[in-house]
Amino acid sequence: MNQYPRYSFTNDPLKPATIFLGDHQTPVWIQQRWEEGEYAGFIQKNGCGHCCVAMAARLQGVEIDPYEEFSLCCSMWGIPDLKQQYGYLSVAGIVKIMTHFGIPAVAKDTFRQGTQAAAQDICNALKEGKQVILVSNAKRYKDNPFSPGTHYILAVGYTEDGRILIANSTIRAKDLAVQFADYDMLEQALIADGGANPTLTWGEPAIQPENFGYVIVG
C-alpha cells in the first residue's frame, strides 16, 4: 500500500518546508535563496530542475542537495554556457542523473500523446507511489499558480484527502514551497509540445521544446 506524503513548515527561508514520504524526507529548497558555492548563481536563476532532482532523489533514499547535484552535472557534462544553455536540465538530463544514483526514471513527451493523456499518465504514476518532475508553463495556463514562467515542479504524490502535493522551489509561486493540484491543473500547466530527446543533457534554447516533457521517478 502506498504511503501518503506529509509536510510541515519551518522558519528557514532557504528551506521553508519539509516533505515526508515513508521513511524518507526532503527539504523544499527555494532556489533564489541559495548562496553557497561557486555555482550559486546558476541555482538561483535556473535551479528549479536541480532542486526537483535533489528532492526526488532524497525521497528515494539518496541524500543530496541541489548544489551537489549541479556539481555532479558539471562533472559529467561540463560547466554550461550561461548565455546558451542557462544551466537548466532537459528531462533526458534528469533521467541520466537519476540513473547515476540507481533510481528508476523515465522521460516522456507531451507533444505525441497530448496533454490530457500526459496528465492522466502523471496521475496514474502518482497513484502507484512514484514521483513526477514536470515542466509547468504559463502559456496555456492563465494565472498559473506554480510560476509565471517555464519552471520545473515536483509532484510528490496524492495526500490522504486526494490532492496532489507539489513541491515548488521558486519564490514566484503563489504559495511558497508547498502547493496542491489536481488533474485539470496539471493538464493546463503542461507544455503542449514538450519533448524528451534522449540525447540532451543541459537544456538548449534553440530546441527548447525538446527539453520539456516530464520524468516519472521511482
Residue locations for each model-derived region?
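Active-site-adjacent structural segments surrounding the nucleophilic cysteine of cysteine proteases
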Residues: 1-88
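Mixed-charge, low-complexity intrinsically disordered regions
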Residues: 12, 91, 217-218
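Noncatalytic regulatory segments and standalone regulatory/sensor domains
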Residues: 18, 45, 146, 158-218
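Solvent-exposed, acidic/flexible segments
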Residues: 41-50, 87, 91, 115, ...
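Extracytoplasmic/secreted envelope proteins and their assembly/folding machinery
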Residues: 49-57, 91, 95-98, 119, ...
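Cysteine-dependent hydrolase recognition
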Residues: 55, 59-85, 107, 189-209, ...
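Mid-length scaffold segments of soluble, non-membrane domains
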Residues: 79-83, 87-111
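Active-site-adjacent substructure of cysteine-protease-like catalytic cores
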Residues: 114-171, 175
